[in-house]
Amino acid sequence: MSFIIDKQTLNDLGIFSHKKEISVYALYNNARTRGGSQILEEMFYNPLDNYELIKRRSALIGYFQRTSQSFPFKAIWFDAAEFYLSDTDERTRIVSDPALGNSEKSALQRRLKKIIKTDTEFEQAERGIISLIEIINTLNEFTATMAQDKEITSVTTELDKIREIIDSEKFAPVIQAKGIENLSQDQAAFFDNLLRYENNEQVHYLLNYVYHIDVYISVATTAKENGYVKAEVLPAH
């Protein structure tokens, strides 16, 4: 839950300053992704009023402040991934060609087919798919470390949901494809169906979690650099 904060209060507190002085938002916004910056803005517009939710958010920020972790994802991955995921028109679906076999002739046909589409949708889709593979694999390693911290696991169930998705059998091919640099037509068709169509909701859930991590690390870094002390969260009386 969150309480409503009006524009006048936001201005009085200098949350989003339109003047030359730095705003509170600008002070804490060192996010590496556009998604992270947007979520931080939403947090200021919709402050939490629930003790458990505030405690959880505080614990997550405290964890990143304590461990001094940096954001391990590349911003360029998210631009490519978001652009790719935004178009779910069936006409843009990548399909494998069952007529192409393993012979040298078929291999040549396959390469020619890819070249024809290089400057259009195939190249963009391939870049988006590979970016998602990198994001999910990085998130896999990152959350595996987080899951070992009792302070985090004791206050949030979100991490369990993330691990459930990543550890599921359907995402196993994504983990196995770590570090892949190019996709064949069949590989592109397989991952396109898996990520953009069959599991679109789960993929967006993972991305949203990464954007929140971006925010927590951004806030934690600002706090540590400026010597800020984390306030103790107490329940209302």
Where are these regions (language model features)?
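Conserved amphipathic alpha-helical "coupling/scaffold" segments
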Residues: 1-173, 202, 209-212
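Extended, charged coiled-coil "arm/hinge" scaffolds of SMC/Rad50-like chromosome-maintenance ATPases
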Residues: 166-192
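An accessory alpha-helical subdomain
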Residues: 195-198
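Conserved NTPase motor "head" modules and their coupling/switch loops across ABC/AAA+ ATPases, GTPases
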Residues: 4, 205-237
